[in-house]
Amino acid sequence: MEKPSREAFEGNNKLLIGIVLSVITFWLFAQSLVNVVPILEDSFNTDIGTVNIAVSITALFSGMFVVGAGGLADKYGRIKLTNIGIILNILGSLLIIISNIPLLLIIGRLIQGLSAACIMPATLSIIKSYYIGKDRQRALSYWSIGSWGGSGVCSFFGGAVATLLGWRWIFILSIIISLIALFLIKGTPETKSKSISLNKFDIKGLVLLVIMLLSLNILITKGSELGVTSLLFITLLAIAIGSFSLFIVLEKRATNPLIDFKLFKNKAYTGATASNFLLNGVAGTLIVANTFVQRGLGYSSLQAGSLSITYLVMVLIMIRVGEKLLQTLGCKKPMLIGTGVLIVGECLISLTFLPEIFYVICCIIGYLFFGLGLGIYATPSTDTAIANAPLEKVGVAAGIYKMASALGGAFGVALSGAVYAIVSNMTNIYTGAMIALWLNAAMGILSFVIILLLVPKQNDTQL
């Protein structure tokens, strides 16, 4: 049961705009670095490995802490956690722009990850609390425009700002947007869960989760350098497997677990969350395709970002279409249609062996299908996950759902980048990009199968 300060409060457009602006601090601004990797190498006088760590660490830390933050939002207040997240983004952005020291870049990006971990589940919970029925679906559509739409715009946005104003302006603008979001959310009554007791936070679960995910990230990003037979590689693999096994055992026994596995008894929630993880994993497409056209075809970051304009346009248009399809067809069909269309787009973008002019045409069309598919998928998936969560666990459920988003993006970028680098070194940059993009298409196919098997045609939602 919810217990907001003013039970009669209903969500309005002012609050919704503040929520969307807070969401894009991660999905638009923080994610824009996928298209400015070469520029950051020069600006910080460092190697691509360090820059790739800085690019992926935000989503990684967001994913590691988002579930815990969702639980804290349920216990201590969703408005409070949202405001804390916005302030953390301002701090992280300041650390990134004040110097050319790579360590501060990484620390700033890490703090931005913590910011996103606070904002995402808290804002979804606010929507669950203060918007009802079609108003909630509308609010979720705009939330999806901030998240999926922001990820669609980020490549072009990052390239345009970096080319025209300088890359630091990405984060200057992020600070300005954060201040506006704080102003718009101010005055909204607090909402928190009444039924969850304030038990001790699951520190053991969080530590094990962090150890597991950091070990996996290092294995993916540095595995080829370490060598699969090296002692360090084997040790990290053992740590990852061991910490994962221990995490499962402890979480099932814990009275107040970091991840409540009972949520996954609902097939609709499980299907939405698992497919969400995989479709966020195809974010690796952006870093591979952008790096390929810059390194292989000699394009600038602005030119590379311009290829994805069709992605930008379609994802923004189709999110509201996805909302209407949800209302008329239910959740499963739009999720399947969106995923299928995305796979077609992914295959077109992977045709790196074509002559430049034909590849550019395929990229433009491919990104169009890419954005169209994600736009159709976004709102039905988010609504399925949130509507199937118990009201008293909505913060944790939203946290797990957005953990899937963040970790999918982090590992998608890391894995795609690793495959791209390894295959390029073994063959050439064209084959490396093609194989890495095929990996993303495979994730889309697996997502399609999961939706087909787990998401029911008519799921019973809690609206």
Swiss-Prot record:
Subcellular location: Cell membrane
Biological process, per Gene Ontology: response to antibiotic
Domain of life: Bacteria
Known function: Multidrug efflux pump that acts independently of NorA and is one of the factors that confers resistance against diverse quinolones and chemical compounds.
Family to which this protein belongs: Belongs to the major facilitator superfamily. TCR/Tet family.
Signal peptide: none
TM helices/strands, residue ranges: 17-37, 53-73, 86-106, 107-127, 142-162, 165-185, 201-221, 230-250, 273-293, 299-319, 334-354, 357-377, 403-423, 435-455
Species for this entry: Staphylococcus aureus (strain COL)
Keywords: Antibiotic resistance, Cell membrane, Membrane, Transmembrane, Transmembrane helix, Transport
Recorded GO CC terms: plasma membrane
Gene3D superfamilies in UniProt: MFS general substrate transporter like domains (1.20.1250.20), Multidrug resistance protein D (1.20.1720.10)
Record membrane topology: Multi-pass membrane protein
UniProt keyword Transport present: yes
A molecular-function term among this protein's GO annotations: transmembrane transporter activity
The protein, known as: Quinolone resistance protein NorB
